[in-house]
Each structure stands twice: as structure tokens, then as C-alpha cells.
Amino acid sequence: MTMMTMMMVSWSAFLQICWILMVRANQFNPGEPSGCRTNTPQSDLNSFLWTIKRDPPSYLYGTIHVPYTRVWDFIPQNSKQAFQESSVVYFELELTDPSTISALSRCQLLPAGQNLQDVLPPELYLRLKTHLEYVRLMLPSWMTPDQRGKGLYAEYLFNAIAGNWERKRPVWVMLMVNSLTEADIKTRGVPVLDLYLAQEAERMKKQTGAVEKVEEQCSPLNTLDFSQVIFALNQTLLQQESVRAGSLQVPYTTEHLITHYNCGDLHSIISHDTAQVPNFNNVTLRPSDQVTAQQIDSYFRRELIYKRNERMGRRVTALLQEQPHKTFFFAFGAGHFLGNNSVIDVLRREGYEVEHTPAGQPLHRRSGWRSADPADTDAALQPFLHHSRHHELQLLEGLELLEKVEHKLKKKHRRNKLKKQRQFNDLWVRMEDSVTAEAPPPLIHIINGYITVQTHPQEHERANHDRTFSGSSSRTGPALSALAVCVQMLRLLL
């Protein structure tokens, strides 16, 4: 399936981006994202690491839900070192547990006996079906030569992402549609940063865990008012229809967000105060749509920002208290640590001293530890900084489709727990089950729509294998597309 992003920031960050986009939609100048606006090397800019000052120290790290290969070279060495030196690694969810995958899939489905056609307005359903047919036709041209070279084929890829879409709840269909874009399709095949960290933690025999349950992440979306879900799905379709017609460029893309992450400047697009209510005077939404958007905002703030960050912060505190002699590494979407009402605020209220750790700053050590020599640090990081084409292509296992995954993996778990390799990816978008897909060709691994390819051994030698760590669309103006853009931010940053 598919942190700083998908991102993979808090719900508060998501909402702030939404409102900024809606208020300033007409001010954006679409185009290619530029590099960091500074002469400082990019590798020295990106620090989403915070240190919990105690003995021994623990760490908070902000992830982004994009392929790890897009951001890993820009992550500072001290962030990687913090991961290496931590004995316990916690994520939002159990990222490699097959039961997590199954639960995430089940939570997307409509009640037994219901199909999407039964619950959507007829006109909206037909528009959705038309758009998915368009995506199916376009997929072959969207795929990269590298993907085709690995053996992926378009029909299988479509079924892996959108299979069984008529059984999904509308809110999950909205997220699915938002991920069925050319830019997103081109990223399929490489684990997102969160999953890669989880797999590395398992490989390094670290203790792992989660601070949230699947139900806690699913329930707020599934209980969103139905009329508001229809509003959001309609806006998402309007945006995609406008892009198809050539009348709209998405003003803020995944590429822009990756640039902000790699430059370490997410604060440039995220307000510091989650309590601020933007001025809507410049918004071109109709008054009724503004009311709906504000209702969604109020719901998200209550259920998905404050409650979630408070709950996560309390559980981090409990873990620190229960195991005071262990070094923790908490890897959550970066926005959980940004702005007010964050996880960091909860920890500080509980009496913990939490400080941002810039790139290049030495890590705090246990009492009595000597300062690290650079040569010693490099040697200590070698097990963590490995990276080969062979390892990259073997990160995900399992050819079974979603309905087979749970049964087979659990059966294997009972037979031999040590032989099990479990999968996970993007928490919100790339969790689609694909029960309509036929058996894939050998060495192509799919779990809930997130695809990783394992090539044959003779294909492992490549020149770049040595990377480190080793409606009508005419109704859609810039402001009308803002909600759909916000969904993009949601899946990448939360």
C-alpha cells in the first residue's frame, strides 16, 4: 500500500494547506518546482528530526508518503544515525503487519450487499465511471520505460489500484481517484519512506510498534457526513475532468511538496496556528459550497487534528514512561510535529523537553558516552546506509491479491513466524484491494495496490544502484480545485 509526504504531515497541516490553497488559489503560478532558494547544500537543509532530551535520548522524525528514493539522499546524516542508534521504532500503524492491510481494506468497503451505484447520485456515478475508463486507456502511455522493463503491464496495474472500486465507500473512491494520475502512476514500484523505514527496522532486528489502531484512522473518514463526502468527490472529479480537458493545471503538485520537504521548509506553506480561520473574501466558491467546506473543516479539526495528535502524544508519553532506559525513534507524518496542537506540544505539556535537531548537529548521548568521532559514526552507520539494487527490488514480498493475502500470510505465520515478510504502504491512498485482478506475472509484488517489482538476479547490475541507504469541468476554477489538491496533500503528508 501506499510521511512528511502520502504523506507520509498531520491533519492540521492538511487543513491549513487546504485553506491556504482555497484563499490564494488565484495567486499560484503553476510550473515546475524550483530548487532550494539558498546557497546551502540541499543535504544540509532537510531536518525533520526532533530530540526528546532524556537519558537516553529518544527521537521524533517526520516522514513523507512518497517513494523513499525521491527524498533519502537529502535526509541529514544525523537523522539516519538516530534511526540506527534507536532500539525501538514506532510508526503510526503496524506498517508490515498483514492484519493491518486486511483491516485497512475492510474499512473501505460499503456494507454487505451495497454497491457504489446504489449510493451515489446517478450523474456523479456515470462521471466517475467515465473517468476510470479514461484512466484505464491512458495507463499504458503513463507508465515509464523502467516500469515496463520490470514487467509491469497496464491492465494489471489498473486492477491493482482500482479493482473492486464499485464496492468501496465514496470517500475512499475519492482518494483513489486522486491517486490515479500520471504523476502518481509513475511512482509505483518503490516503497514510500515510511514503509522503507519499517522494513529496515525489521531487517535490523529492532523492536517495532504503532501508536494508532486502524480503526482510529479509518473511522473519522467513514463517519464524515455523506453530503460532505459527495461534495468532496464531486470536486475531485471536477479537477480531474478539467485536467483531462486541458483547462486546468494543478497549482500545487507532489513535486512541489517533495522540493519543500527536501529543502526543509514545509513551514513556508503551513500556517503556524491551527486555530486561525482564513479570510474567505477572495474565495470563488459559491456561498453554499463555502458553508460545506467550513463544515468539513470544523469536523476535521475536531476529529482528525486535535483528537488524533492528543491521542498519539499520550501514547508516546506512556511508552517513554514504561521503558525509560530505551531509545525510541517515532516516525510519523511530518505534520504531526508542525504547528500548534502538535504531538510535540502534548509531550511538552507532560514535562518533556523537545528540541529541533538541525542537520549537522551532533546527537545527544547517554551520560558517560564520549563525543562521536566522524570515522566512528561512519562505521556505526554502515549497516544502516547499505543500499543495492538487489535490496531495493526485494523490499516487498507477496504475489497474492488482497483477498488472498490475509489468508495465505496468516497461514504462513502460523507455520513459521520467522519466514514471514509483511507489507504496508501509503496509509490512505494505496490501500486499494484488487480482487478483480488476475494472477500477476512472477516477481511482481502487489499489496493493496502498491506495487514493487523484484527483477531476476541478472538484472540487478545498474549504473545507479549505489544510492545511499542504504459535473462539468467548466465550473472548476482555481478555488474549486483546492479541495482536490488538499486531498493530494493529505495522502502525502499525514
UniProtKB/Swiss-Prot annotation:
It is found in: Cell membrane. It comes from the Eukaryota. It is a single-pass type I membrane protein. It holds the Pfam family TraB_PrgY_gumN. The chain crosses the membrane at residues 468-488. Its cofactor is Mn(2+); Co(2+). It is an enzyme of class 3 (hydrolase). Belongs to the TIKI family. Metalloprotease that acts as a negative regulator of the Wnt signaling pathway by mediating the cleavage of the N-terminal residues of a subset of Wnt proteins. Following cleavage, Wnt proteins become oxidized and form large disulfide-bond oligomers, leading to their inactivation. This is Metalloprotease TIKI1. It comes from Danio rerio (Zebrafish).
